[in-house]
Amino acid sequence: MFLEKRDEMAWPKMIDQEILAARPGKNRLDPWIPYAFLVESERSRRGTLDEVLTLFLTNQECSFRCTMCDLWRNTLDQRVPLGAIPAQIDFAIERTPPARHIKLYNAGNFFDAQAIPPEDHGQIIARVRSFETVIVENHPRLTDERSVRFRDQLGTQLEVAIGLETIHPEILAGLNKRMTVEDFDQSVRFLLKHQIDVRTFLLLKPPGLDEASGREWALRSLKHAAERGVGCISLIPTRPGNGIMEQLQTQGEFSRPTIQSMEWVLEQGLEFVRKHHPTTRLFMDLWDVESFYDCLQCGPARAERIQKMNLSQQIEPAVPTCVCGHS
């Protein structure tokens, strides 16, 4: 493993000031309109292929400055006006086909009062309670009775998505998330105790890991999450794009994972959950997948295979050996 070849302290913990100083500018946004929304198919916990409406809500920037995060580019510097979040939900629902589930992703923490005003919870609930599942994202340290109160009012299945990223303790500390693996575990126990489903985000090859170690720790991390009762695991190939990641790339501390690693981790993960946690779903994120191609001839076929595995939750036939040498 890359870190084992160096002084443990050589991988620096990022601090807010360094991360902020490296940033490019933000995008200009309207607080009354979500900055993006889409409907896509996802394998449900029942095993059906369902349509899911995902809203990327415009709101105040998250107070956590995670090293790898670029979601702040589509956030505001101030709290949204009361009524803005319900209006954003209306805007998206009116412009999309029907869906069974809804994700309210806000580039931060749903239960942060400065991001999503609690005064709007009632109006939000009125708009989403007809969905079978309502999925929000939240930091472990903000996961408490607020989520239970929201669930009680909601009257449908609530699911909270938490970014674990990795169980590697030094790498997690270097991501500036201000959390530990135990913080994550406690949050999962709390949510499951209150009949709130949990999904988690994991990074494939965060800064500080080489290709082999990136694969290994992604697999270890997904096993850890599944063993804690997480019902849905989303693997995110780590990307540049926020300033500090480019600096780490220049310093040799970070490089994108390969699409072959994306395939391998998804394969190994699906095999593990099939044997040990058959109700756990596992997805590999394919946003900007073209940037992970190292061969334009077999890259698209590998992306298509990953998408098929995302939808089927089964290991699909391998891509034939390519002229590039990868099989």
Language-model-derived ranges and their functions:
Residues 92-97, 124-129, 147-157, 188-195, ...:
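Acidic (Asp/Glu)-rich catalytic clusters
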